[in-house]
Amino acid sequence: MSLIILTRDDEPRIFTPDSDAASPALHSTSPLPDPASASPLHREEKILPKVCNIVSCLSFSLPASPTDSGLASPTIITREGQQFWAKCLIWKYQLYLHGLHKKSDGRRDKQISASPST
């Protein structure tokens, strides 16, 4: 299974679960290649442990500092409402965290789709 996530720099990246490792995690292969180019995906890095059981989440207040690799870590919003990194994460593992599916007026979704591309 692969999925695409927007990171702090708004670059789409492919994430794949690592089920063979002792501590399973998502692996990021970034950046996505230009469709016109034949360059392969590269630079894998463990990001999140699989036990987070996240399906999706949104965040709009992002920390200014990136990780060592220059990638923003995926955002997770915990039951306590803590916000971490990135904008949108779709992770097809199991459960969702309480309150994660709640949408107030859909304004957040519109902000994502209406964000200008640079």
From Swiss-Prot:
Region Disordered, residue ranges: 1-39
Residue spans of biased composition, Low complexity class: 28-39
Lineage: superkingdom: Eukaryota
Tissue: Mainly expressed in placenta.
Name this polypeptide is given: Down syndrome critical region protein 4
